[in-house]
Amino acid sequence: KCLYCYKELKEGQKDFHPSCARKFFGTKDVPLLEYKHEELDQLAEQVIRAQTSLTGVQPKLSLNLDKHDGCSRLTIVGLWGDYIFKPQTESYVQLPENEDLTMHLAEAAKISVVPHSLIRLADGKLGYITKRIDRQENGEKIDMEDMCQLTQHPTEYKYKGSHEQIAKTISQYSNTPKLDLANYMQLLLFCFVTGNNDMHLKNLSLYRPAEDYQLTPAYDLLNV
């Protein structure tokens, strides 16, 4: 089945429908991801030394989409790549599949989510990939602040907030507070139904894609 939409593939198609690849990557064919899972630990160590890894308990790497002569590939870069990639982890089995499925369930519940998909490594193992929403197509930064920043909590206290505190923060900083509070409540109910016990302060953000600050589409959703 297609790793993006979960629908059946036609004969000769591999991993993605051409339309799904175009929708997510902007290319007719799936970009090459020429890394094996066994190489990722060493690569992660290199990027940590270079301070190019992204924050969070789940391993994350930043990827850039490079297009050359009709062939496109995803390469590990610094912090500001086009995509965020999460590989398999020994601590939690099939975590990429869990996250992608939960994001699909959220979409089915009419919750706005960031663009996301599964993608296959060179050795056949699956990883989770999501498109960054804090960058414009020209690479210019979009203002985005998570609830740790907005409530002045250091990252190590990301589990110390409350839903009441987050709701008050949305009311204070959002330019569309009533709409965002309604969307936030819908997301909370979804997390309760799916058993998500990891909705900490860094998993909720406000951003300014145009003139106004608003709640971002949902991201980092799990059923654990």
Language-model segment annotations:
Residues 34-35, 77-78, 172, 176:
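Short, flexible segments with low predicted structural confidence
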Residues 1-38, 212-215:
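Regulatory N- and C-terminal appendages and interdomain linkers associated
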Residues 2-6, 34-54, 111-114, 125-133, ...:
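Charged, low-complexity, helix/coiled-coil-prone segments
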Residues 35, 142, 158-161, 176-179:
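Short coil/turn linker and secondary-structure boundary residues
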Residues 39-158:
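Conserved ATP-binding subdomain of kinase catalytic cores across diverse folds
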